[in-house]
UniProtKB/Swiss-Prot annotation:
Keywords: Cytoplasm, Lipid A biosynthesis, Lipid biosynthesis, Lipid metabolism, Lyase. It is an enzyme of class 4 (lyase). InterPro entries: FabA_FabZ, FabZ, HotDog_dom_sf. This is 3-hydroxyacyl-[acyl-carrier-protein] dehydratase FabZ. Involved in unsaturated fatty acids biosynthesis. Catalyzes the dehydration of short chain beta-hydroxyacyl-ACPs and long chain saturated and unsaturated beta-hydroxyacyl-ACPs. The active site is at H57. GO terms for molecular function: (3R)-hydroxyacyl-[acyl-carrier-protein] dehydratase activity. It catalyses: a (3R)-hydroxyacyl-[ACP] = a (2E)-enoyl-[ACP] + H2O. It is found in: Cytoplasm. The gene is fabZ.
Length: 154
């Protein structure tokens, strides 16, 4: 772990489980290696061959569905929002997706890094620019919006 990540903050799987309501098979962030307050984060997803979506996408040439890359970005952004606004006492709803682009396939054995950067925040609405990278190469990108809602209001 580098010194900057220690200063900025990290989240292991136990903390992620406290921040996000997602569970297997839909929890798509294994670890967060860097969190800069409410401004940015880098989440990690270790892609393995035994994930359920690979049985049908595609049996002879498994490729991680692009929608799951977007969801991993959203979960990383959601962890920032949840951590900043009271942890597990709130829900973070994924609201919008714009400018999504998929550049390269993600396959079993890849380690995806979800880089999310807050673009703006107004009240309980947050906007992020997100990149997904494998071995430093851009594989997907999108702009996403999220809304924070108290669990009591749901």
């Amino acid at each position: 772990m580098n010194e900057a990540a220690t200063v900025l903050g990290t989240a292991d799987i136990q903390e992620i489980l406290k921040l996000l309501p997602h569970r297997y098979p839909f929890l798509l962030v294994d670890r967060i290696i860097e969190i800069d307050s409410d401004n940015s984060a880098i989440g990690i997803k270790n892609v393995t061959a035994n994930e359920p979506h690979f049985t049908g996408h595609f049996p002879e040439k498994p490729i991680m569905p692009g929608v799951l890359l977007i969801e991993g970005m959203a979960q990383t952004a959601g962890a920032i929002c949840a951590r900043k606004t009271g942890g597990g006492s709130n829900l973070v709803y994924f609201m919008t997706i714009d400018n999504a682009r998929f550049r390269k396939p993600v396959v079993p054995g890849d380690r995806v890094e979800f880089h999310v950067v807050k673009q703006k925040q107004r009240g309980n609405i947050w906007k992020f620019h997100c990149d997904a990278k494998v071995d430093g190469q851009l594989v997907a990108e999108a702009d996403i919006g999220a809304m924070i809602v108290s669990k009591e209001d749901v």
